[in-house]
Structures are given as C-alpha cells and as structure tokens.
Regions:
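Topology signature of small-to-medium multi-pass alpha-helical membrane proteins
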Residues: 1-139
C-alpha cells in the first residue's frame, strides 16, 4: 500500500510520527534537565517522592525517544523496535500510576492518561501491516 502523500520517500504517517516523537523527545529532555537543575530548590519539587528519580526518568525517556525517532526516520528496524518498547513501557508505567500502584516515583497523574492515549496511538500506527513491512518486522 503506497501513501499518496510522501516526503523524501516516507509516507505521511511516518513524517507525522517522527515530527510528533521528535517534539515529545525534545520536551522531555528539556524538562528532565530543568527538573534536575531545579531539584535542589525546594520550591521546584514536583513531587514529595524522590524528585531526582522522576528527573532522570524524564531525561532518559526524552533521549531514548530522540534516538529511536532518528531510527524511524532512517527506516531502521531498531527505531521501530525501540519506539514500540518505549511506548509499551509508558503505557504500563502510566497505567500503574493511574491505579495508584508502584511505578516511577513522581509521574504526574494528570499526564498519565494523555500519555497512554498517545502511546497507544503510536503502537496502533506502528502495528499496521504496511509499516511493519517497511521496517522488516514479520507480520
């Protein structure tokens, strides 16, 4: 199945996915660094639970998203696999947070539901047959 709209040989879906993932990665890297820098200031503590853990988690998540997004853009199988793995992790971690079960300390409950919806959308798109074929994932 060929997309009618392409950019540099990539379907519109891949272009949208990489732009969105790039923005998600940049925002998380920025906030991860900001939270690490501001963590020593009591006024900036996001959660009473170990703010350093959430800061490092946010930074690491952002960096992984950026790395795997570059793989998606370059049509690399590891980009697809990494994006799927990170998306599944986010769904699980945020679902645990919403259920008040042990998860990453400091994940804001207000952000969990939108992150789950976004991650499930990414997983739905990446699981489509034409995308799996592009990244040489067995169907």
């Amino acid at each position: 199945m060929r997309s009618l709209v392409t950019y540099r040989g990539r379907s519109l879906g891949i272009v949208v996915l990489t732009v969105l993932q790039f923005l998600v990665g940049v925002v998380h890297v920025f906030f991860g660094l900001w939270l690490l820098a501001a963590g020593s200031q009591p006024i900036f503590v996001v959660s009473g639970q170990s703010p350093e853990v959430y800061s490092v988690y946010t930074l690491a998540f952002g960096l992984l998203v950026l790395i795997f997004t570059s793989g998606i853009w370059l049509s690399k199988r590891w980009g697809w696999g990494g994006t799927v793995a990170v998306s599944v992790f986010v769904v699980v971690a945020d679902a645990l947070t919403l259920l008040s079960l042990p998860s990453i300390p400091g994940i804001p409950r207000f952000a969990a539901a939108p992150e789950i919806i976004y991650s499930l959308s990414m997983l739905l798109y990446l699981s489509q047959t034409h995308v799996r074929i592009k990244y040489k994932i067995s169907t």
